[in-house]
Amino acid sequence: MDEITAIREGIEAAFERAYNEYHVKTFRFFLKRVRMHETAKELTQQTFIKLWRSRHTLSESFSLDTQIFTIAGTILIDHLRKQAS
């Protein structure tokens, strides 16, 4: 079973492996854009919470990396919109 299928099926160990593999890269993605350490940490956390909560929508057609950064991009846009209003 691959990681995407395992996460989609709710196997926490697979989610933990994905978190361990991608959380630093995700944090750096946010830090580069928001330039605030705590905000980048919060947005990273939101990304992985959303990944877990929407795990049933994960697709085998796209890499896990692509799907995580799609979520991260959406969260960043939402954050920036809130900041602008």
Residue ranges of each PLM-predicted region?
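A short, charge-rich alpha-helical start-of-domain segment used by transcription regulators
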Residues: A6-R28
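Amphipathic alpha-helical recognition patches that constitute DNA-binding helices
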Residues: R17, K25, T39-E42, S63-I71
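Arg/Lys-rich amphipathic alpha helix in sigma70-family domain 2
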Residues: R53-E60, T70-S85
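Conserved RNAP core-binding helix
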Residues: Y19-N20, F27, H37-S54
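Helix-loop interface residues and adjacent transmembrane-helix termini in multi-pass membrane transporters
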Residues: R33-V34, S61
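Short loop-to-helix capping motifs
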Residues: I11, M36-H37
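Intrinsic, short, N-terminal disordered tails of RNA polymerase sigma-factor systems
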Residues: M1-T5
